[in-house]
Regions:
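Active-site His/acidic residue clusters
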Residues: 41-47
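Carbohydrate-binding surface patches
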Residues: 85-122, 153
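C-terminal beta-strand-rich structural cap/linker in extracellular carbohydrate-active enzymes
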Residues: 139-159
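Short, exposed beta-strand/loop patches in secreted or surface proteins that constitute
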Residues: 82-85, 95, 134-139
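Solvent-exposed beta-hairpin/edge-strand motifs
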Residues: 120-133
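Conserved alpha/beta catalytic core and glycan-binding cleft of carbohydrate-active enzymes
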Residues: 1-41, 96-98, 105-115, 131
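Aromatic- and carboxylate-lined catalytic core of secreted/periplasmic carbohydrate-active enzymes
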Residues: 48-87
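Hydrophobic, well-ordered secondary-structure elements that form the walls
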Residues: 19, 31, 68, 104-108, ...
């Protein structure tokens, strides 16, 4: 997360979204939620001390982490099934679901796209985008989603 040569904020958000949706405990290093900076070269310089002045925080990143944390607090996620589906070489989906609720996290490292996912056996009476910019709707047992370049999107579905 501190490698400026490979860091891409939008792709990073997708990786964090996947982490929050996968089973197990999400793990953040202090300050990640507010976009704290660091410098490369040594472990000591990899992270600056925590910045407590909110005017220096990346509020968009904080809003993103809050949305992921809120989704993660759903009690049903503790016993939900999961599935990972490859969309193509630049996108994949993490699905968490029970008989009554589901989250679909679509992680896009590529260009603007439209995706059709098989949602057989997932609850799909209602669909809401929890985080991200795009459109999502169900048609039969398919979830059709369109979203922008490098945009990752979290969708909630329920009966």
């Amino acid at each position: 997360h501190n490698d400026k040569a490979v860091f891409d904020r939008d792709i990073y958000k997708g990786a964090i979204m996947a982490m929050y949706m996968l089973p197990g405990m999400p793990n953040l290093y202090y300050g990640d939620e507010v976009g704290i900076k660091g410098r490369l070269g040594s472990n000591e310089g990899a992270r600056f001390p925590m910045e407590w002045r909110e005017e220096y925080w990346d509020m968009d990143m904080l809003s993103f982490h809050r949305a992921m944390g809120k989704a993660r607090k759903e009690k049903w996620l503790g016993y939900a099934s999961y599935r990972i589906e490859e969309v193509d070489e630049k996108a994949f989906a993490v699905l968490r679901f029970t008989d009554h609720e589901a989250y679909v996290a679509l992680i896009n490292r590529g260009e603007k796209r439209e995706v059709k996912l098989d949602i057989f056996a997932l609850p799909s009476d209602r669909v809401e985008i929890v985080y991200g910019k795009g459109e999502a709707k169900t048609e039969g047992k398919e979830l059709n989603v369109s979203f922008e370049e490098k945009e990752s999107i979290l969708i909630k579905m329920w009966k």
